């Protein structure tokens, strides 16, 4: 058997002498007892046992192979170099191998005494061992990583003493120091960082502070101080942000409360009259006149004594003026009229009409009924103070003038004015309508004649129209005013 890859041949024949008895003795069956086998072995002659064979010497050959590959041996091994005599035994084999199994262990103390060392064996070297390469991949055992000693750090201390003003070595200087001190770059950087930290703690810092380099960390104290400063800045920013958020939330809350207050002021009013106070606000003289006239003259003199509302006060709600105050005042007058007798009949009759006829009166009823007391004062045309016939003298309000007023204040005109006042918003009413009606006394006659000529109301009105036409020449009037009044009133007569 040969090993050409190892560079030397090797014979596989046994190199130890043995006898047949020895083989038979070693290979006896296990059925025999221990005492019998011991007695048989002692009776025979000593023999050489085949302890080492070729396969048992592979480890030794492998170690020597690495030595041969490294050039320790100049030529391949042969059997003539004494490799076969690697382990030799003396003539007496019982001194090395005792066949007595019950022999004491003291006899083995001289077992290795008779084994001489061969000339081919060399002293142990760690480079020839099984783990001959260290972790850095080099054969030099002196370059292995080890702890820094005073001898190695003396070079670093000398360099630090020379560079006290700038104890920050560059990359090249670190490599040079690592080669000189046989240390790694990490060890050199760590040593310099610790040295700077130690000098700073001892207040021996002779260099200006600098920012962190890319290849090393700053001292621990500098990092702590900067972290504290950053934390304080962050805390200040958080506090300022919190204060701003609180102010914004407070402003939003105040805004919401103000909106709620406005909403309450608008929505929580229970009375409609309070909401419409700007439209209702007017002097109370008209109501006082209405109450006094209703008591004294059966609501007839309201036409003459009612003040003319100016153009700025046309926005008041006529529904409130006509119905609600009138009904309330007439209720008060009914209580007072029990003592005054017949003076309260007109107001009581007016209250009955308002209670019995809440709807709009029909044209047929208004055309057939000419009794002035059946209608409230709001349905009568407000004229008198500005008309020349009523303002001339107190005698002008006599029978002919009363007849003319009654016929001029016919239900059609009163109904028209009342509908315009109730169902039209004050913003859509022109301020010249009531002025035109009060500045002339013949506006109704002209309007009535025009309507009769067109044939729209000929059937419903009949005799009162003829009476008005017959009395028209007796009434002094101004044609210019009449024409202007007709244009102004006609444009607003039947507004939808």
Swiss-Prot record:
One Pfam family hit: Homeobox_KN
CDD domains in the record: homeodomain (cd00086)
Domain of life: Eukaryota
Keywords: Developmental protein, Differentiation, DNA-binding, Homeobox, Neurogenesis, Nucleus, Transcription, Transcription regulation
InterPro entries assigned to the protein according to its UniProt record, in alphabetical order: HD (IPR001356), Homeobox_CS (IPR017970), Homeodomain-like_sf (IPR009057), Iroquois_homeo (IPR003893), KN_HD (IPR008422)
CC annotations in GO: nucleus
Region annotated Disordered, chain positions: 203-236
Subcellular location field: Nucleus
Biased composition (Acidic residues): 221-231
Gene3D superfamilies: Homeodomain-like (1.10.10.60)
Family: Belongs to the TALE/IRO homeobox family.
Protein name: Iroquois-class homeodomain protein irx-4
Species annotation: Xenopus tropicalis
Name of the encoding gene: irx4
């Amino acid at each position: 058997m040969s090993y050409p890859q190892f560079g030397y041949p090797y014979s596989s024949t046994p190199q130890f002498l043995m006898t047949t008895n020895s083989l038979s003795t070693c290979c006896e069956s296990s059925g025999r007892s221990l005492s019998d086998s011991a007695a048989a072995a002692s009776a025979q002659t000593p023999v050489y046992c085949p302890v080492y064979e070729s396969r048992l010497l592979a480890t030794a050959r492998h170690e020597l192979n690495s030595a041969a590959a490294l050039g320790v041996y100049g030529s391949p091994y042969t059997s003539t170099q004494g490799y076969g005599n690697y382990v030799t035994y003396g003539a007496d084999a019982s001194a090395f191998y005792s066949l007595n199994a019950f022999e004491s262990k003291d006899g083995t103390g001289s077992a290795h005494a008779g084994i001489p060392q061969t000339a081919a064996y060399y002293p142990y070297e760690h480079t020839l061992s099984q783990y001959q390469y260290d972790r850095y991949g080099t054969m030099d055992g002196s370059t292995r990583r080890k702890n820094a000693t005073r001898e190695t750090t003396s070079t670093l201390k000398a360099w630090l003493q020379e560079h006290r003003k700038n104890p920050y070595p560059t990359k090249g200087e670190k490599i040079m120091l690592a080669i000189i001190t046989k240390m790694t770059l990490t060890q050199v950087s760590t040593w310099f960082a610790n040295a700077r930290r130690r000098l700073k703690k001892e207040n021996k810092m002779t260099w200006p502070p600098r920012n962190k380099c890319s290849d090393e960390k700053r001292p621990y104290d500098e990092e702590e101080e900067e972290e504290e400063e950053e934390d304080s800045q962050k805390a200040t920013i958080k506090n300022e942000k919190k204060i701003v958020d609180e102010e914004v939330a407070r402003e939003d809350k105040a805004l919401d409360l103000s909106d709620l207050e406005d909403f309450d002021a608008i929505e929580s009013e229970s009375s409609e009259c309070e909401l419409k106070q700007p439209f209702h606000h007017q002097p109370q003289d008209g109501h006082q006149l209405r109450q006094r006239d209703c008591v004294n003259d059966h609501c007839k003199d309201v036409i003459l004594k009612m003040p003319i509302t100016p153009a700025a006060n046309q926005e008041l709600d006529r529904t409130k003026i006509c119905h609600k105050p009138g009904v309330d005042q007439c209720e008060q007058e009914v209580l007072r009229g029990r003592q005054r007798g017949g003076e309260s009949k007109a107001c009581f009759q007016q209250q009955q009409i308002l209670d019995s006829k809440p709807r709009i009166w029909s044209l047929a009823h208004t055309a057939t009924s000419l009794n002035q007391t059946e209608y409230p004062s709001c349905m009568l045309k407000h004229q008198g103070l500005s008309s020349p016939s009523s303002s001339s003298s107190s005698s002008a309000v006599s029978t002919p003038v009363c007849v003319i007023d009654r016929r001029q204040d016919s239900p059609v005109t009163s109904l028209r004015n009342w509908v315009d006042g109730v169902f039209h918003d004050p913003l859509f009413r022109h301020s010249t309508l009531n002025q035109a009606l009060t500045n002339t006394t013949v506006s109704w006659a002209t309007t009535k004649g025009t309507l009769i000529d067109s044939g729209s109301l000929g059937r419903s009105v009949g005799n009162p129209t003829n009476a008005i036409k017959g009395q028209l020449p007796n009434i002094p009037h101004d044609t210019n005013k009449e024409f202007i009044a007709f244009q102004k009133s006609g444009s607003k007569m039947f507004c939808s």
